[in-house]
A protein has these predicted regions:
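N- or domain-start disorder-to-order transition segments that initiate the globular core
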Residues: 1-15, 118-120
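Conserved phosphate/anionic-ligand binding catalytic regions in large, soluble enzymes, centered on
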Residues: 24-35, 44-56, 138-153, 300-314
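Short beta-strand elements
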Residues: 34-39, 45-48, 126-132, 291-296, ...
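A generic, well-ordered mixed alpha/beta core segment in the N-terminal half of proteins
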Residues: 46-90, 100
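Accessory "access/gating" subregions that flank catalytic or transport cores
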Residues: 97-98, 102-132, 203-295
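A conserved active-site cap/scaffold subdomain adjacent to cofactor or substrate pockets
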Residues: 148-154, 158, 164-247
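Hydrophobic alpha-helical bundle architecture
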Residues: 282-304, 311-319
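Conserved small/polar residues in nucleotide/adenosyl-binding loops
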Residues: 321-326
Length: 332
């Protein structure tokens, strides 16, 4: 984590940014999870990551009792998980609320797969859970993001970022040609142009950044992915609420992989904590989640941690530790 933080702080596009690391910081792919920073006119797509808009949808229901077996059945029968998506004939109706053809990179992503992914959980650390607070109120939480669509968008713009830094622009090529002509070296133009197809990138590929028009296009497409992730979670919650006959008394959303465009703040594994804002911080299956209220601390980019953090990957933990049964873990 320390090496990744140092590497990030040494990048040219971070100069002048207010960078803050959350208490749950841990190493990620390319950068640390638990990062928040202010941005201006450049950004590395990898800092947001591949699960654009990932977060939690939380509802508090009127009911004081639920049937766990029925809830489990509703979820398993109505919400695809893992690599599964919906059939085109069985898409959730919320897919009509977003137009993926508006993406600048629409021809580089699987739009139809995206529509069929609305209302699907995915894998990894994504989850659906029921919680009860100290006053007996019951909450349902859905944690998921933009699914494969977010991955495709992130990979496209990260590749485009690196290409933009290693490929000479038309203006640069024209300047080289003009210099050769002014030096009387017109005959060398074609041979020299063949040797300068690539230039050295000022940053590593995984930390390459978008700027100018590419920056604006990324922000545009990222916002669409964030909207997609929000609809995805709400679609799953819709399945649960209708299947269980729940009555919603309160709901709120907590996002942790995105750029707050209104305030130009990037949050990677951190969440918005504006003054008075209600947010959710999940800990683990045994200890549940924390319902918190933001303090609006500007020095910390109006942000809070998105979880408890971890010392190793899930796969490494499975190899080193024997998990107790869910009942034993919850009762410990």
């Amino acid at each position: 984590s320390i090496c990744q933080v140092i590497n990030l702080l040494n990048q040219p596009y971070v100069e002048g940014s207010r960078v803050r690391m959350m208490p749950d910081i841990h190493a990620g792919a390319g950068c640390t999870i638990g990062t928040t920073m202010t941005i201006k006119d450049k950004i590395c797509p990898n800092l947001v990551g591949v699960d654009i808009g990932c977060g939690m949808e939380t509802i508090r229901i009127k009911e004081s009792h639920i049937e766990p077996q029925k809830l489990d059945k509703v979820i398993r029968n109505g919400i695809p998980s893992g690599f599964e998506i919906r059939q085109s004939s069985g898409r959730h109706r919320f897919y009509k609320d977003i137009d993926l053809s508006e993406l600048h990179c629409a021809n580089k992503v699987d739009v139809e797969r995206g529509y069929s992914s609305v209302g699907t959980l995915g894998g990894g650390n994504h989850f659906i859970e029921a919680n009860k607070d100290d006053e007996g109120n019951i909450y349902i939480v859905v944690h998921s993001g933009s699914r494969h669509l977010g991955l495709e968008i992130a990979n496209f713009y990260q590749d485009a970022a690196y290409k933009s830094l290693t490929t000479y622009s038309k203006d640069e090529i024209d300047a080289i040609i003009a210099e050769l002509k002014s030096s009387g070296r017109e005959k060398e133009i074609q041979s020299i142009l063949k040797t300068i197809k690539m230039k050295n990138s000022p940053v590593p590929k995984q930390l390459a950044y978008v700027a100018g028009e590419l920056f604006e296009q990324y922000l545009h497409d990222m916002r669409i992915a964030q909207r997609f992730a929000d609809l995805n979670r709400k679609a799953m919650m819709d399945v649960i609420v209708k299947g269980m006959g729940f009555h919603i008394e309160e709901r709120f959303t907590t996002i942790h992989n995105y750029i707050d465009v209104d305030n130009m703040i990037l949050r990677k594994g951190s969440v918005s904590a504006q003054d008075g804002e209600v947010l959710l911080i999940p800990i683990n299956m045994r200890d549940g989640s924390l319902i918190c209220v933001g303090k609006g601390n500007e020095d910390w980019n109006f942000s809070a941690p998105h979880g408890a953090g971890r010392l190793m990957s899930r796969s490494a933990a499975c190899l080193l530790y024997t998990s107790p049964s869910p009942r034993d873990a919850h009762e410990s």
